[in-house]
Swiss-Prot record:
Binds to the 23S rRNA. PANTHER family: 50S RIBOSOMAL PROTEIN L15, LARGE RIBOSOMAL SUBUNIT PROTEIN UL15M. GO terms for molecular function: rRNA binding; structural constituent of ribosome. The keyword Transferase does not apply. Keywords: Ribonucleoprotein, Ribosomal protein, RNA-binding, rRNA-binding. The gene is rplO. This is Large ribosomal subunit protein uL15. The keyword Ribosomal protein applies. InterPro entries: Ribosomal_uL15, Ribosomal_uL15/eL18, Ribosomal_uL15/eL18_sf, Ribosomal_uL15_bac-type, Ribosomal_uL15_CS. Residues 21-31 have a biased composition (Gly residues). Pfam families: Ribosomal_L27A.
Length: 143
């Protein structure tokens, strides 16, 4: 085999079907579009979601919920995240520097998820009851 003799396998390539080129082709005259009507015309199709004038589904259903603008300023941290940090004094700045929380976070909650074995001091963070108990059981403190 040589590079100049490589060919596609038999049947792998076919000619593009040309429409509107005579009765014998099977796609002549109306080019497979049938007779008359909106769908037979050029540009004759409705936009996505259009239901022929009937009230569309997305307008029939009620609006629900909203996007809280406070979300980027709140963050949750797991106990397993605290375990992985190289420092023992943990505050918002330490979490931001470690990349555990986003730069915009202002309020941080420590939640009981995962486990903690090392002694850490948590400052300036909110801790849930379970998380506080787990930190104190490991010999740490929540200030």
């Amino acid at each position: 085999m040589e590079l100049n003799s490589i060919q596609p396998a038999d049947g792998a390539k076919h000619y593009k079907r040309r429409v509107g080129r005579g009765i014998g082709s099977g796609l002549g005259k109306t080019s497979g579009r049938g007779h008359k009507g909106q769908k037979s015309r050029s540009g004759g199709f409705h936009k996505v979601g259009f239901e022929g004038g009937q009230m569309p589904l997305q307008r029939r259903l009620p609006k629900r919920g909203f996007k809280s603008l406070a979300t980027p300023y709140k963050a949750e941290v797991r106990l397993s995240d605290l375990e992985a940090l190289p420092v023992t004094e943990i505050d918002i700045l330490a979490l931001k520097q470690a990349g555990v929380i986003g730069e915009l976070a202002r309020v941080v909650r420590v939640i009981l998820s995962g486990s903690i074995t090392k002694k850490v001091t948590v400052k300036g963070l909110i801790a849930t009851k379970g998380a506080k108990a787990a930190i104190e059981a490991a010999g740490g403190s929540v200030a």
